[in-house]
UniProtKB/Swiss-Prot annotation:
Pathway: Amino-acid biosynthesis; L-arginine biosynthesis; L-arginine from L-ornithine and carbamoyl phosphate: step 3/3. One of its GO terms (biological process) is arginine biosynthetic process via ornithine. It comes from Staphylococcus aureus (strain USA300 / TCH1516). This is Argininosuccinate lyase. HAMAP family: Arg_succ_lyase.
């Protein structure tokens, strides 16, 4: 007799190395808790519908719980010859409780079983990711709240642009993460759907109650089409996309952390707890955690591309190709959860070198736009003002000083309307004070932005 659940039709058994290639138990045992949760709901419903006896259902449920307990105590060894988590659990269940265990699969296929597992798993992981994003956002708000008056240079093309508040800069990542959080939240509507009861693809002749299992498993809704229920992997692609985009945002933030921590910038100092050294250069303190996060975005994006390619040519309904949906998702989930935790700790423990930042904006030309705006207040067209300031900057570069160092007489050679108040006008802190448009870097606008962010976090 074959040890395969499907072995009755076959005359020759696969060799061990073929079993190993076909099996998914090495990675889909990640789904053991979801598989048992789904099976308990299915067994409960079968008994309530009179399809199996209450006694058999109770035996099945107790057997499943004992398997779950023993697995987490490392007391169960699963077999590749049994292919996957579903058949390994069923085999162990029958071994423990006898023929009653063979009734569990009544009215169910591995097709809807694995889909149920994956929906339950993805829902839980997305909820965890949302919580981790919110936690990181909270740390960002705390840092920003303490640095509203800290001034730093902003950049375009990695060239100094304009002075801005450090709080305003770091809050940019709050809003990126807010959109990420919203995408994950919205995706739950498409994840939180029950496929159980679709069976292989066409439903079942048994009088099952899919609404009951939907309630037992706390799903928000159920699939209206059994074929769609076992064919759908959109929610996995969507989750991989949302993970990848969030990782892109973390990667951008990590790149800035790396730059800020260089000797050339010295804007921040990373904690030793989130840095490493060199095996040959004793002086080194490397931002390895930030670099790893920056690098891991390629990994999660690769999983997204892989899943898109897996599905692109699949006919309905289930195909073995779909086994490839798991490892990429599991790894992407592990990657983003780890990255979010590391990022939170890394920025929570970093030191912001406020004096260095405040001094930096006095040693560049990031206040050049302010000089042009000053000339505009003297009724000079902006394009003309731009030309005048460009010439002043060029002269400063040639003579080795900055706009705050230019003598008033020199300014007036370029335009007679420039008065002594120009020096106060060009001070970085005053540059920020004049930025009062909604969402700008001015202190009052940043404080307003922080109030909105705190309100969002409290919801």
């Amino acid at each position: 007799m074959s040890n395969k659940a499907w072995g009755g039709r076959f005359e020759v058994q696969p060799e061990e190395w073929v079993d190993d290639f076909n099996a998914s138990i090495t990675f889909d045992q990640t789904l053991i808790d979801q598989d048992i949760e789904g099976s308990i709901a299915h067994a409960t419903m079968l008994a309530n519908q009179g399809i199996i006896s209450q006694q058999d259902s109770e035996q099945i449920i107790q057997g499943l719980k004992s398997i779950q307990h023993d697995y987490h105590q490392d007391q169960i060894q699963f077999s590749a010859s049994l292919e996957d988590i579903h058949l390994n659990i069923e085999h162990e269940l029958i071994k423990r409780i006898g023929d009653a265990g063979g009734k569990l699969h009544t009215g169910r296929s591995r097709n809807d079983q694995v889909a149920t597992d994956m929906h339950l798993y993805t829902k839980k992981q997305v909820q965890d990711i949302i919580a981790l994003i919110k936690s990181l956002q909270s740390v960002i708000v705390d840092i920003a709240s303490n640095n509203v008056d800290t001034i730093m240079p902003s950049y375009t093309h990695l060239q100094r642009a304009q002075p801005i508040s450090f709080a305003h800069h770091i809050m940019t990542y709050f809003w990126m993460l807010q959109r990420d959080q919203q995408r994950f939240e919205d995706s739950l509507k498409r994840i939180d759907i029950n496929p159980l009861g679709a069976a292989a693809l066409s439903g079942t002749t048994y009088p099952i109650d899919r609404h009951e299992t939907t309630a037992l498993l706390n799903f928000g809704s159920l699939y209206e089409n059994s074929l769609d229920a076992v064919s759908d992997r959109d929610y996995i692609i969507e989750t991989l996309h949302n993970i990848s985009l969030t990782m892109v945002h973390l990667s951008r933030f990590a790149e800035e952390i790396i730059f800020w921590s260089t000797d050339e910038a010295k804007f921040i100092t990373l904690s030793d707890a989130f840095s490493t050294g060199s095996s040959i250069m004793p002086q080194k303190k490397n931002p390895d955690m930030a670099e790893l996060i920056r690098g891991k975005v390629g990994r999660t994006t690769g999983h997204l591309m892989s899943m898109l390619m897996t599905l692109k040519g699949l006919p309905l309904a289930y195909n073995k190709d779909m086994q490839e949906d798991k490892e990429g998702l599991f790894d992407a989930v592990h990657t983003i959860k780890g990255s979010l935790r590391i990022f939170e700790g890394m920025i929570q423990t970093m030191t912001i070198n406020k004096e260095r930042l405040n001094q930096t904006v006095k040693e560049d030309f990031s206040n050049a736009t302010e000089l042009a705006d000053y000339l505009v207040t003297k009724n000079i067209p902006f394009r003309t003002a731009h030309e005048i300031v460009g010439k002043i900057v060029l002269e400063c570069i040639q003579q080795g000083h900055y706009l705050l160092d230019v003598p008033l007489a020199t300014y007036q050679q370029h335009h007679s309307s420039i008065d002594a108040d120009i020096y106060d006008y060009l001070q970085p802190e005053n540059c920020l004070k004049r930025r009062q448009s909604y969402g700008s870097t001015g202190q009052s606008s940043v404080k307003q932005q922080l109030d909105v962010a705190k309100q969002l976090l409290s919801q």
